[in-house]
A protein has these predicted regions:
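Non-catalytic, surface beta->alpha helical segment in thiol-disulfide oxidoreductase systems
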Residues: 60-88
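Conserved short-loop catalytic and cofactor-binding motifs
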Residues: 11, 33, 46, 68
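Charge-patterned, long linear interaction tracts outside catalytic cores
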Residues: 90-96
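Residues that form or flank phosphate/diphosphate-binding pockets in enzymes
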Residues: 17, 40, 66
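Thioredoxin-like thiol-disulfide oxidoreductase module
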Residues: 35-53, 79-90
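Local sequence-structure signature of Cys/Sec-based thiol-disulfide redox active-site neighborhoods
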Residues: 1-31
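Structural micro-motif
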Residues: 50-59, 69
Length: 96
């Protein structure tokens, strides 16, 4: 079982590229939603992230974890890998 990771992106977004590169470097599969030209996807992103309107917005097992800076902070603090492992094991993801 793997964690379900979703990322909302837009075209020409350096932060999006950076977040996807981090996930890819860890071998984490993710579903990408390009919301740049899709107003419905953008509304969905904002609603799911509880108001997050910047790109990217990242979700692990449906829980919002923030954007590129937040996911890199989690990695730098040594909290990203355990978070992904918990999600893969089916345990509740705690992002705070």
């Amino acid at each position: 079982m793997t964690a379900r990771v979703e990322i909302y992106t837009r075209d020409y977004c350096g932060y999006c590229t950076r977040a996807k590169a981090l996930l890819s470097s860890k071998g984490v599969p993710f579903t990408e939603y390009d919301a740049s030209m899709d107003p419905d996807k953008r509304r969905e992103m904002i609603q799911r992230s509880r108001g997050g309107a910047t790109y990217p917005q990242i979700f692990i097992n449906g829980r919002p974890v923030g954007g590129s800076d937040e996911i890199h902070d989690l990695d730098r603090e040594g909290r990203l890998d355990p978070l992904l492992a918990e999600a893969a094991a089916g345990r509740k993801v705690r992002t705070t």
